[in-house]
Amino acid sequence: MDIISVALKRHSTKAFDASKKLTPEQAEQIKTLLQYSPSSTNSQPWHFIVASTEEGKARVAKSAAGNYVFNERKMLDASHVVVFCAKTAMDDVWLKLVVDQEDADGRFATPEAKAANDKGRKFFADMHRKDLHDDAEWMAKQVYLNVGNFLLGVAALGLDAVPIEGFDAAILDAEFGLKEKGYTSLVVVPVGHHSVEDFNATLPKSRLPQNITLTEV
């Protein structure tokens, strides 16, 4: 299936079939998608919680209480549930972790190339954390890049998913001790196979026309 067909076919799943699980291979593939998403300057300011056990999914679903109870069954019935978390502050320890990993992966021919790469990343990191004072917002944007990449990727694997912002982040952060670890939850994405109750699976896709959303120059 070509990428345009995938984009046209995927939809936000409103109900999952709890009896259908990801295969072990698919479970590994979705983790690879998370790992290899693009991010600004390859900063990767994220962490993911992947819940596949009933206990794990129930812990995530605690955040779908009160005003968000309509999302609870999605979290409980999906095969896997991914919590996308962003770093709350960019620090030099993380930047060193990134450049050292790039070095270990063979991206630099010389020490000078590594130093230049590190300097360039720190320029943008410092611009956001010291000049614009919006590093938290900048890092959240990178996580959303990952979410978009992930949604298209899981659809290409023949899986169904739905991005959820309707959850109590304070409850979820507390449940997993995210604040203490320097993260906060942004998006929850259940993944699995839609059920016959998923009304959205049979509805036509609707988007604004290109003459409204696109300008060619």
UniProtKB/Swiss-Prot annotation:
Q: How does it assemble?
A: Homodimer.
| Cofactor(s) needed | FMN
GO MF terms on file?
6,7-dihydropteridine reductase activity; FMN binding; identical protein binding; NAD(P)H dehydrogenase (quinone) activity; oxidoreductase activity; protein homodimerization activity
What EC designation does it have? 1.-.-.-, 1.5.1.34
Its domain of life? Bacteria
What is this protein's function? Reduction of a variety of nitroaromatic compounds using NADH (and to lesser extent NADPH) as source of reducing equivalents; two electrons are transferred. Capable of reducing nitrofurazone, quinones and the anti-tumor agent CB1954 (5-(aziridin-1-yl)-2,4-dinitrobenzamide). The reduction of CB1954 results in the generation of cytotoxic species.
Recorded family membership: Belongs to the nitroreductase family.
The UniProt entry, under InterPro entries, shows: NfsB-like (IPR033878), Nitroreductase (IPR029479), Nitroreductase-like (IPR000415), Nitroreductase/BluB (IPR050627)
Q: Which residues does the record give as NAD(+) binding sites?
A: 14, 41, 71, 74, 107
Look up the record and report any one GO term of the cellular component aspect. Answer: cytosol
Give the organism, scientific name.
Escherichia coli (strain K12)
* Name of this protein: Oxygen-insensitive NAD(P)H nitroreductase
GO BP terms in the entry: 2,4,6-trinitrotoluene catabolic process
> Which residues hold FMN?
10-14, 71, 165-166, 205-207
Presence of the UniProt keyword Transit peptide in the record: no
Catalysed reactions, as listed in the record: 5,6,7,8-tetrahydropteridine + NAD(+) = 6,7-dihydropteridine + NADH + H(+); 5,6,7,8-tetrahydropteridine + NADP(+) = 6,7-dihydropteridine + NADPH + H(+)
A matching Pfam family: Nitroreductase
User: What keyword terms does UniProt attach to this protein?
Assistant: Flavoprotein, FMN, NAD, NADP, Oxidoreductase
Q: How is its activity regulated?
A: Subject to competitive inhibition by dicoumarol, nicotinic acid and acetate with respect to NADH. Subject to uncompetitive inhibition by dicoumarol, nicotinic acid and acetate with respect to nitrofurazone and nitrofurantoin.
